[in-house]
Amino acid sequence: MPGDDDYLPDGTELLQITGNPGVAAAARVGDSLLGDPAAATELLLDMVAEGSARTVPEPMARPRELPQTPSSPLTPPEVYATLSRVRPPDAVIVNESTPTTAQQVEWLPTVRSGSFFATASGGIGWATPAAVGVALGDRDRGVDRPVVGLIGDGSFQYSVQAIWTAARHNLPIVYVVMRNQEYSILKSFAVLEETPGVPGLDLPGLDIASVARGFGCRAVDVETTGDLEREFKAALSAGTTTVIVVPTEPQKAML
């Protein structure tokens, strides 16, 4: 049977706090404490000294190059590089353009604590209402910062009604919808599982901007990096929720 040394680096101790006896019994390494994780977390927070948080390091420099003439439609790196030039430093990123997450992290990185939100895996349609939740939470806490939702056109269809709530409350959200006219992540999974050609994964003909206007949002279609930069700046000062729709090249997800 493998021992602790096969899973943990030398000198590392692992303590698991769980309310599930089965999970505690199944732990391969370390010790398990059976109890209320929420109560334990509150007690642990009381033990953390003020000022102990380390400074977030700057992102590592990476050799990057975009084409001198922007593509048509734009590539996700071109979209993210454009947004990186005009995004306010305190802006929040809520990401559910799942196939392009790695490119977003590279070209539009976040370095401030509490400024990046994304689902770990699984469900589709999380980020559109999550951006509403972040903005409402900021308002309740008296925090004034823009929220940027990076959403794929497929993900946007699952919970589009959330933008009605955003518009009703005049939340400072800028949704940038990457319109590649397909469920890229599902196509990538189909290839991974050796089941290509799954029907129903193409999304042609969607007029997302008109749908967004129907829910009360300000909405625009853009084609170029210049259009995107101009409309994003306008959205930051619009005083309401804006949906910017950007045609992009389909990307194979990094699974």
Predicted regions and their residues:
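Short, flexible loop/turn segments with low-complexity composition
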Residues: 52-63, 245-248
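Active-site diphosphate/adenylate-binding microenvironment
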Residues: 57-142
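Generic detector of well-ordered alpha-helical packing
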Residues: 19, 96-97, 154, 246
